[in-house]
Amino acid sequence: MSVTSLSFPYGESICWYSPDELDRLPDGALADWLLASGSLTARLRAHCSQFEVRVLGEAMLPGLPGEPQLPHTWVREVLLILDGTPWVFARTLVPEALLTRCGDELTALGDRPLGELLFSSNLFTPGRIEIAGFHSCGTLARLAESLGQNVHGRLWGRRRYFEREGDELIVSEIFLPAAMDYILGPQ
């Protein structure tokens, strides 16, 4: 699995919506995955024997269009890998004020999943979920293809807000084609 021909950051501008606003919220299993209120990390672990986080990059960067435009935001992008297959591309945005308060809690995660920190303590309060269904021909499609996964339809994802002391951390999770194939099952 090589992503060397690409470079961090991989995220792209995505239009996110409240599930109430989306005209065509997917039915069945996909909607269940998108709207689940618990930890996606825990749910993914339940579907594999080996779970891995591969960090693609971390840095102070400006937000993309459609993201909060704060002067200083720490961005972390990772792949969540199940039994050797990348399932989820995740992009986390942490405003500088929150990063200053949290310090190493966030910046020293390394290959540990952020979801474990967010759901294992009462320091963060899970908030609203937004979803997106989109046709990617940009960096996410190229990332998927570099991982041996062809984007053959819409990619779906969710964006979750977590509040701590008045600041919001945002986690966007995009289901890669391998995950979509599993969730949707045989067509």
From Swiss-Prot:
Q: Which InterPro entries match?
A: Chorismate--pyruvate_lyase (IPR007440), Chorismate_lyase_/UTRA_dom_sf (IPR028978)
For this protein, the Enzyme Commission number is 4.1.3.40
UniProt keywords, alphabetically:
Cytoplasm, Lyase, Pyruvate, Ubiquinone biosynthesis
UniProt enzyme class: lyase
Q: Where in the cell is it found?
A: Cytoplasm
Catalyzed reaction equations: chorismate = 4-hydroxybenzoate + pyruvate
The answer to whether UniProt assigns keyword NADP to this entry is: no
Gene Ontology terms for molecular function: chorismate lyase activity
Q: Which Pfam families match?
A: Chor_lyase (PF04345)
Q: Name one GO biological process term.
A: pyruvate biosynthetic process
Q: Which GO terms describe its cellular component?
A: cytosol
Q: Which residues are recorded as binding substrate?
A: R76, L114, E173
- Pathway the protein contributes to: Cofactor biosynthesis; ubiquinone biosynthesis
Role this protein plays:
Removes the pyruvyl group from chorismate, with concomitant aromatization of the ring, to provide 4-hydroxybenzoate (4HB) for the ubiquinone pathway.
By sequence similarity, the record places it as follows: Belongs to the UbiC family.
Q: What is this protein called?
A: Probable chorismate pyruvate-lyase
**Organism, scientific name:** Shewanella amazonensis (strain ATCC BAA-1098 / SB2B)
Q: What is the lineage of its organism?
A: Bacteria, Pseudomonadati, Pseudomonadota, Gammaproteobacteria, Alteromonadales
